[in-house]
Design a protein with these regions (language model features):
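Active-site substrate-recognition segment that forms the wall
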Residues: 1-20, 65, 74
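FAD/FMN-dependent oxidoreductases across multiple families
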Residues: 21-131
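C-terminal helical "tail/cap" subdomain of flavin- and related membrane-associated enzymes
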Residues: 101-263
Length: 263
């Protein structure tokens, strides 16, 4: 299930189902709320503001994301799945890119639009591989948790790097590790490994492989069994891993206020 609550009290919510459930959308919704009582309690007093609907497929992808005098934002161009909530961050990254394009003139250059188009294609593939791996692993929580670590390492490394080492052109760095020599190929490789992780030994090796694969960008100490999946904000871990960010210990410590928006 996905659930997005807005400030004015309206919530966008829905279920993603592997197989079609018989009945009208209203009947399916009520059935799922009964099946999951905790969710049912949360939505017990909710009323729909529009008719409930069923869509056989939510994924889409167009042939191009940009052309002469036009460009699409990511979700107009392609959508994969709500899992990992990539939408807002990806859209903001694209808006930043387009804003940079307009800094050089009234209309973005053909070269900039081609670059924008190529990045959105590559990033759609990246999201697709990451989500496909997560669905493949979903029946085994330990495998799913390991797959999720790939996502969390990607976003935490990028967020920390952009705050501690800001760059005017950071928007052109690929979303979710696209173009990163350390992480760029990890989602596709993880999907391939998950498809062949049939035995317990294979599954243990996959978890170990993820830990090794994300290590060069793991600034937050993720994939640590001792935490039992609970990761508080731990600046000491970040400071110890200053080299991962290409910073000295002293320079990282002095830059820490930037993590909360300080100067």
């Amino acid at each position: 299930m996905y659930s997005l609550r807005f400030d004015h009290g309206v919530t966008s919510a829905g279920f993603l189902l592997r197989d079609r459930v018989p009945g009208t959308p209203e009947q399916v919704w009520k059935h799922l709320l009964r099946r999951y009582p905790t969710i049912g309690a949360l939505f017990g007093d909710a009323r729909p503001l529009m008719p409930l609907v069923y869509r056989p497929r939510i994924q889409h992808r167009l042939a191009r994301a940009a052309g002469e005098r036009w460009a699409m934002l990511p979700h107009a161009f392609a959508f994969v799945d709500p899992l990992f909530s990539t939408g807002i961050a990806w859209s903001l990254r694209a808006i930043e890119r387009l804003a940079l394009c307009f800094e050089t003139g009234c209309n973005p250059s053909e070269r900039d639009l081609a670059r924008y188009d190529a990045l959105l294609h590559a990033e759609t593939d990246q999201i697709d591989w990451l989500v496909a791996g997560a669905y493949h692993a979903m029946a085994r929580f330990d495998l799913f948790a390991a797959q999720a670590m790939i996502y969390f390492v990607m976003v935490s490394f990028t967020e920390v790097l952009q705050r501690l080492r800001p760059s005017e052109t950071c928007a052109w760095s690929g979303f979710l590790g696209v173009g990163d020599p350390q992480l760029g190929g990890v989602p596709r490789a993880s999907l391939r490994r998950l498809r062949h992780a049939r035995t317990r030994a294979d599954q243990r090796e996959f978890i170990s492989w993820v830990t090794r694969a994300i290590a060069p960008r793991n600034v937050c100490g993720l994939a640590n069994p001792a935490t039992h999946g609970l990761y508080p904000v731990d600046l000491e871990v970040l400071v110890r891993r200053h080299a991962v960010l290409g910073m000295s210990r002293a320079s990282l410590v002095s830059a820490l206020p930037a993590l909360r928006g300080g100067a």
